[in-house]
């Protein structure tokens, strides 16, 4: 077997539709576009959500909500990521230094995911109840 002798399995590839190549092809004349109308013309069609001039659904419904900018600068930190920090004190700065958080993150919360094996001191970060219990069970502490 050589690369130049490889070919797809029989029936695996379908031949392309050749539009406008005579009546016998089944796709001659109108080429599968039907007769007349906006969608039969070349370079034409309607945009997404267009309903023929009727007020479209996305404009009939009221606006709602917004995206909080605080969510863009907030991150979650798993328990097993705390072990990647050098030393046993975990702060926002040490997490950034260990490449766990990006430099634009301003707030972080330690969540109960993974395991913490060594005693660590978490300083200045928010911590969930479960994560707090796990850190204290491993001999660590949480400082505000």
Curated annotation (Swiss-Prot):
Full protein name: Large ribosomal subunit protein uL15
Cross-referenced Gene3D superfamilies: 3.100.10.10
GO molecular function: rRNA binding; structural constituent of ribosome
Gene that this polypeptide is encoded by: rplO
One GO cellular component term noted in the UniProt record for this chain: cytosolic large ribosomal subunit
InterPro entries: Ribosomal_uL15, Ribosomal_uL15/eL18, Ribosomal_uL15/eL18_sf, Ribosomal_uL15_bac-type, Ribosomal_uL15_CS
Alphabetically ordered keywords of this record: Ribonucleoprotein, Ribosomal protein, RNA-binding, rRNA-binding
Family label: Belongs to the universal ribosomal protein uL15 family.
Gly residues compositional bias, start-end: 21-31
Residues annotated as transmembrane: none
A Pfam family per the record: Ribosomal_L27A
Gene Ontology biological-process annotations: translation
Residues covered by region (Disordered): 1-52
Function as written in the Swiss-Prot or TrEMBL entry: Binds to the 23S rRNA.
Subunit and partners: Part of the 50S ribosomal subunit.
């Amino acid at each position: 077997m050589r690369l130049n002798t490889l070919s797809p399995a029989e029936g695996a590839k379908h031949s392309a539709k050749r539009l406008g190549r005579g009546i016998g092809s089944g796709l001659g004349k109108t080429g599968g576009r039907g007769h007349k109308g906006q969608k039969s013309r070349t370079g034409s069609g309607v945009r997404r959500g267009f309903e023929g001039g009727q007020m479209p659904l996305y404009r009939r419904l009221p606006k709602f909500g917004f995206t909080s900018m605080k969510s863009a600068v907030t991150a979650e930190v798993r328990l097993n990521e705390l072990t990647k920090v050098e030393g046993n004190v975990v702060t926002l700065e040490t997490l950034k230094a260990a490449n766990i958080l990006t430099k634009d993150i301003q707030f972080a919360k330690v969540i109960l995911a993974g395991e913490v094996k060594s005693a660590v001191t978490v300083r200045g970060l928010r911590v969930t109840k479960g994560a707090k219990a796990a850190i204290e069970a491993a001999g660590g502490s949480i400082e505000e």
